[in-house]
Amino acid sequence: SSFAKQIAMIEAGLQKPVLKVGNLDSLRTWSDVRDAVNAYYMLVTIDPIPGEYYNIGGSFSCSVRDMLDHLLSLSKVQGIKIEVETERLRPIDADLQVPDTTKFKNHTGWKPEIGFEKTMQDLLDYWRQRINSNKNFLSR
């Protein structure tokens, strides 16, 4: 969300065309929050089993760099520079972790519905709308 927010602020002229980033080589498994909320809803409404545990998450994995490249390809501004800030680097970064959602899928029939590309487009559009609806938007 930080990258999408920064891109939207650059597009609105509220930030110089420099994107502040951390480690772009980390691998992440991505899931749309709308899919996660749907999973949580199903968890409590479809035959919940007290004390049972489930993994919920996405199955699409890529590097943070690939995710950023995708967001930049959606930007209305070309030539945005990337600047690594040491305070954004984690002292220890986990290797790729992909949740095994088999048990939850078998119990509920749930599966992620919203693809990575749509998630990234919607995320950038959200920040564009939020920033453009209030030019006095405070960067936090």
How would you label these PLM feature ranges?
Residues 1, 22-37, 52-73, 89-92, ...:
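Substrate-binding strand-loop-helix patch
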Residues 1-5, 12-17, 33-34, 42-54, ...:
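Glycine/proline-rich active-site loop of Rossmann-fold NAD(P)-dependent oxidoreductases
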Residues 44-45, 75, 127:
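Protein kinase-like catalytic domain
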Residues 18-19, 52-54, 62-69, 77-96, ...:
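C-terminal "lid/loop" region of Rossmann-like NAD(P)-dependent oxidoreductases
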Residues 116-140:
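Amphipathic terminal alpha-helices
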